[in-house]
Swiss-Prot record:
Underlying gene: secF
UniProt topology in membrane: Multi-pass membrane protein
Any one GO cellular component localisation term in the record: plasma membrane
Transmembrane segments: 67-87, 187-207, 218-238, 243-263, 301-321, 331-351
Family: Belongs to the SecD/SecF family. SecF subfamily.
Keywords: Cell membrane, Membrane, Protein transport, Translocation, Transmembrane, Transmembrane helix, Transport
Primary role: Part of the Sec protein translocase complex. Interacts with the SecYEG preprotein conducting channel. SecDF uses the proton motive force (PMF) to complete protein translocation after the ATP-dependent function of SecA.
Quaternary context: Forms a complex with SecD. Part of the essential Sec protein translocation apparatus which comprises SecA, SecYEG and auxiliary proteins SecDF. Other proteins may also be involved.
Keyword Zinc: no
Name of protein: Protein translocase subunit SecF
């Protein structure tokens, strides 16, 4: 009987040791292959799925040299166009003459033809302002002399016979006015003052709320947006009007909003980063970009829809050139602002932060721990959210190992509490009860 009891204890101890060894080998495999497992798990998800969930669809910060090169090329083209081509300034900046009269059934092409036959040159612009019975034809041209203005009014009256307030054809229905070039200059001066005040307030807020490196990155991104938008106007030849100047100020607000969204997530991900070795600062910033990527895209799409509606109303329904100029600069600014907030501002922030001693030391610690082959190092090898299941599995296996290693000595010592499902073990040194009352006294 004693030999059977000893055999039972040996079997349980052997089972516990085998379970511990199997669990430890599973943990070792998990530690050695965590990066491979993470990559295989991410491989099962499509690009759009990873893009939507923010689990590392884009490597932006890691390729920031590429994006800096692209951004630098864009800025270089914009500056070259501004320097060599210049801008197409509207009448408000160059000065000129405006002639208007009730539309009636007049078409733009007819007005342009009458203007050319009367003065021998093309008008700067001919637009239909308003709709219905109150619609008017507005002609903008270079500064005309009084004789040229009178000649043009006569030609327009003979061709279209615009009606006055009494419903009868009248030359008084045709009005003209001179626009001074100083008016556009005054608007530009006020816009520059507003821009400087805006940048100062933005710099103060971001410095107090976040940090100075984010301030430098955000201000640089806004200057990038202004330069590229102005370059597009110069390259394509869009007319620069006071509405364009006002639109440039409005896109700064959108660009800043989109940039702050990403920066807020970066600040959240990197809070206390120096106390952990899971990811480097650059990897945390790249994760923040991916986590806010869809939010930025959705914000841009929602911002573009009313701008497109404004352009539709301005061009096809009302024919208001001012609204068209305002909507056009906003459309260009939204596209450029979305690009800069993702591919320029955050990579620039990472570049500035990596010049600090704190971030450099932390990056060296993370890389050193990864290269050492420790479980934490292999866990840190991945830089996206998809590694969390592997880490959870590893922790579960470690817990099983600890429990098994503790149960093995208890089994070897003959614990009075057998494991569930284990074969009952008879205590050593005891005899089978006989069922008789005084059997033990014999």
């Amino acid at each position: 009987m004693a030999s059977k009891a000893k055999t039972g204890r040996d079997d349980e101890a052997t089972s516990a040791v085998e379970l511990t060894e199997a669990t430890e080998s599973a943990v070792a495999r998990t530690d050695g292959d965590s990066t491979t497992d993470t990559a295989s798990k991410l491989g099962h998800h499509s690009f759009l799925s990873r893009l939507y969930t923010g689990t590392g669809a884009f490597e932006v910060v890691g390729r920031r040299r590429l994006w800096f090169g692209v951004s630098g090329a864009i800025v270089a083209v914009a500056i070259a166009s501004i320097v060599f081509r210049g801008f197409t300034f509207g009448i408000d900046f160059k000065g000129g003459t405006t002639v208007s009269f009730p539309r009636g059934s007049t078409q733009v092409a007819q007005v342009e033809d009458v203007y050319y036959r009367a003065l021998g040159s093309e008008p700067q612009s001919v637009v239909i302002v308003g709709a219905g019975a109150s619609a008017t034809v507005q002609i903008r041209s270079e500064t005309l002399t009084s004789d040229q203005t009178a000649k043009l009014r006569d030609a327009l009256f003979e061709a279209f016979g615009p009606k006055g307030t009494d419903g009868q054809p009248s030359k008084q229905a045709i009005s003209d006015s001179a626009v001074s070039e100083t008016w556009g200059g005054q608007i530009t001066k006020k816009a520059v003052i507003a821009l400087v005040v805006f940048l100062v307030l933005v710099a103060l807020y971001i410095t107090v709320r976040y940090e100075r490196y984010m301030t430098i990155s955000a201000i640089t991104a806004m200057l990038f947006d202004l330069t590229v938008t102005a370059g597009v106007y110069s390259l394509v030849g869009f007319e620069v009007t006071p509405a364009t100047v006002i639109g440039l100020l409005t896109i700064l607000g959108f660009s800043l909003y989109d940039t702050v969204i990403v920066f807020d997530k970066v600040e959240e991900n990197t809070h206390g980063f120096q106390h952990t070795t899971r990811r480097t600062f650059a990897e945390q910033a790249n994760l923040a970009i991916n986590q806010t990527f869809m939010r930025s895209i959705n914000t841009s799409l929602i911002g573009v829809l009313p701008v497109l509606a404004l352009m539709l109303v301005a061009v096809w329904l009302l024919g208001v050139g001012t609204l068209k100029d305002l909507a056009l600069v906003q459309l260009i600014g939204i596209i450029i602002g979305t690009y800069s907030s993702i591919f320029f501002a955050t990579p620039l922030l990472v570049t500035l932060r990596e010049r600090t001693e704190l971030v450099r030391n932390h990056t060296r610690r993370v890389l050193k721990r990864r290269n050492s082959g420790s479980p934490a190092g292999s866990e840190d090898a991945s830089t996206d959210g998809g590694e969390q299941p592997a880490a959870a599995d590893e922790q579960s296996l470690v817990g099983i190992t600890q429990a098994s290693s503790q149960s093995a000595p208890r089994a070897a010592q003959g614990s009075s509490k057998p494991a569930p499902g284990a074969r009952p073990v008879r205590p050593v040194g005891t005899r089978r009860p006989t069922g008789k009352r005084n059997a033990g006294r014999r």
